Amino acid sequence: MKNIRNFSIIAHIDHGKSTLSDRFIQVCNGLSEREMKEQVLDSMDIERERGITIKAQSVTLDYVARDGQTYQLNFIDTPGHVDFSYEVSRSLAACEGALLVVDAAQGVEAQTVANCYTAIEQNLEVIPILNKIDLPSAEPDRVAEEIEEIIGIDATGATTCSAKTGIGVEDVLETIVAKVPAPEGDVNAKLQALIIDSWFDNYLGVVSLVRIKNGTLKKGEKFKVMSTGVSYQVDRVGVFTPKMKDLDHLKAGEVGFIVAGIKDIHGAPVGDTLTHTHNPTDKPVPGFKKVQPQVYAGMFTISSDDYPDFREALDKLSLNDASLFFEPEVSQALGFGFRCGFLGMLHMEIIQERLEREYNLDLITSAPTVVYKAVKKDGETIDVDSPSKLPEPGAIAEIHEPIVRANILVPKDYVGSVITICVEKRGVQVDLNYVGSQVSITYDLPMIEVVSDFFDTLKSVTKGYGSLDYELIRYEAADMVRLDVLINGDKVDALASIVHKDQAKYKGRELVERLKELIPRQMFEVAIQAAIGGTIVARSTVKALRKNVLAKCYGGDVSRKKKLLEKQKEGKKRMKNIGSVEIPQEAFLSVLKK
């Protein structure tokens, strides 16, 4: 056991985490030359295209160190984006050390700081590594100072490397061997294994990635899942080298996979503990906290025949993604679908993209909302995660909205413009510090403002250099109202949203104008209105198409013309009473997309 090293890499998007892991695999001969490709561990297409890591992956490598001993390195790749921080905390629960990889040209970013604190809270040894030293703009000394000032860990002798060219990669491996502590645990104790991740394989059933804390798990043995109490028999155990490599057993301190023919998707929940059926341990491994979804949106299939497939797809994804929440929902405008909960907007986009790609579904997503708390006049408090659940304005005493504390790191030149957007988004400044060449700004912002488009705005005003990390801190009373859209007097549930009273008129007007462009003209007038409770705040009309009924008159008497026009008017009036407006799907899509 003293030769096992479990570690993961913490790094901001694009700081070279996946490339560095490729080099580790090459140095330790994990794959033959032929099988090496860029970003071996980013196995999903979306991960490659967007250049981000979404899922945690694990690799076991044998490294012959300079002292002549062979070490087993278990390396768990983690995502860098703020929406996937729960993936990070999960990976860290299985490790004893973490490499903090920082781009020597760019310096420290906000999300790296957040993930680094998670690692320190879990008592991991954090080792700073400066990457990309082959770049002409690299300033290792300045960045080392930044690491010390912002994060507060000693970076004086930080190992430098360039993952792209391969310089210094062996030094990094030596640093891991020297500084990461060996795992603790007893091979002969009762079995305790933590499930770090699970995914569904069409041939094998559920495949789980586990970290054995105590004891040994052999092929053919029976084990049980502690939360459900159900027992299974181990069909295969082994490690990823990154290919699946079968072994006879996994022992304390190791990280590997198990396949036990579990067909039920919820059979091995992530964060659960496995133990032997015949000799169980009494206490589970302390896992990690279950993440609460922060953003909710309705998802609907464009054709209703896809609904059963949609349900199955969500089931399979939720196995692989512990933080996805969903429940059935019915909308008059969009039919059957699910109300889904996500960690943030990127998470929502990724899930939608995975559903469309991996399961061939065509989806519409309603406008995202966060969870409000409505206090009714009779004292009851209800959680509101969709506009339709908001009680009537007369019944509400007050509405509380979630407030997040946002830490923003930006270069000095952009401070002014960042403060401006924070104020526009109803933010309250908490703190502002100059750290090295960067400025750390802390604001309390309403969560709905952060999840809608704050990140994009921040990136554009800081030319891509700003970075953001946020966490929910409290609920605060706010003047929120429900903005309804009425078409010919009928409410369209899919377009309702919860907005701040000050912005309601402006938002309503904008929405109505956009819909006017998108709804095709009918044979009768279509009135589009935005309303708050019983008050109409904006209105627009799609003019009717009319046939020229006088075309056949040629001169003729004025009373004849009047008669024809009156008759047409009557017809239009009757049509308006009984006619219903078909709203094309595109109209919903473009209004919801913004």
From Swiss-Prot:
Keywords per UniProt: Cell inner membrane, Cell membrane, GTP-binding, Hydrolase, Membrane, Nucleotide-binding, Protein biosynthesis
Family annotation (Gene3D superfamilies): 3.30.70.240, Elongation factor 4, C-terminal domain, Elongation Factor G (Translational Gtpase), domain 3, P-loop containing nucleotide triphosphate hydrolases, Translation factors
Highest taxon, organism lineage: Bacteria
PROSITE patterns in UniProt: G_TR_1 (PS00301), G_TR_2 (PS51722)
Topological category with respect to the lipid bilayer: Peripheral membrane protein
An annotated Gene Ontology molecular function: ribosome binding
Binding, GTP: 14-19, 131-134
GO cellular component, one term: plasma membrane
GO biological process: positive regulation of translation
Domain tr-type G: 2-184
Catalytic activity: GTP + H2O = GDP + phosphate + H(+)
Short name of any one Pfam family annotated for the protein: GTP_EFTU_D2
Subcellular location field: Cell inner membrane
Enzyme Commission code(s) on record: 3.6.5.n1
NCBIfam families hit by this protein: lepA (TIGR01393), small_GTP (TIGR00231)
Family from the record: Belongs to the TRAFAC class translation factor GTPase superfamily. Classic translation factor GTPase family. LepA subfamily.
Protein function: Required for accurate and efficient protein synthesis under certain stress conditions. May act as a fidelity factor of the translation reaction, by catalyzing a one-codon backward translocation of tRNAs on improperly translocated ribosomes. Back-translocation proceeds from a post-translocation (POST) complex to a pre-translocation (PRE) complex, thus giving elongation factor G a second chance to translocate the tRNAs correctly. Binds to ribosomes in a GTP-dependent manner.
PANTHER family: TRANSLATION FACTOR GUF1 HOMOLOG, CHLOROPLASTIC, TRANSLATION FACTOR GUF1-RELATED
Protein name (Swiss-Prot/TrEMBL): Elongation factor 4
Species in which this protein is naturally found: Francisella philomiragia subsp. philomiragia (strain ATCC 25017 / CCUG 19701 / FSC 153 / O#319-036)
